[in-house]
Amino acid sequence: MELQQLVPELEIRDLIVSLHKKEILHKINLTVYKGEMISLLGPSGCGKSTLLKTVAGLLEAQEGDVCIEGSSVLNMPTEKRGAVIVFQDLRLFPNLSVEGNIEFSLKLKGISRLQREQRVRELLEIVKLPGMQKRKINELSGGQMQRVALARALAA
C-alpha cells in the first residue's frame, strides 16, 4: 500500500502561530505518514520548536489545523493529544533513579505501584534500556539519558 493511501499520522494544514503579536509560523503545511522519519532543520529562531510545541498543545495556533491520525487536536486538552516533546534540556531529576524519573507522572495519575513497575519495564524495553530501573541518572551516558527522557514522555 502506498503512503499516500494511508491516513497521515500527523497532518498540519495552513498553521499560523503568533507569539507576542509577532507571527512566527505562517501557513505551515506538513504531512507525515506512519513509518516516516523527518527532520526539522533551520537556523535558531526560525520556528522549529514553536511548531512542535503547537502540535503538542503547549502553544495556541491562531489559524489552521493539526490532525493526529486523522483527528483534529487543536481543541483537545494537551494530555489527550497523543503528542509529547522531549526537550534538548532533558530536565531529568538527578536525585531519582531511572525508574523514579519515568514513573513520576504515573504517580501523579494515581496508578498503582504494581502497574507503575510494569509500565516502567515496558517503556525501558521500548527505548532499549531493559533492566536499568535502579540506575542513577549520573551513571548514564548522554544517549541513555535521552532515552530515559523519551520513556518519561511516553509515560505521561
What are these regions (language model features)?
Residues 136-140, 144:
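Conserved ABC ATPase signature
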Residues 107, 114-132:
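Conserved ABC ATPase "signature" region
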Residues 56:
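Helix-to-loop junction immediately C-terminal to a conserved catalytic motif
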Residues 96-104:
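Short coil-to-helix segment of the ABC ATPase nucleotide-binding domain corresponding to the Q-loop/switch region
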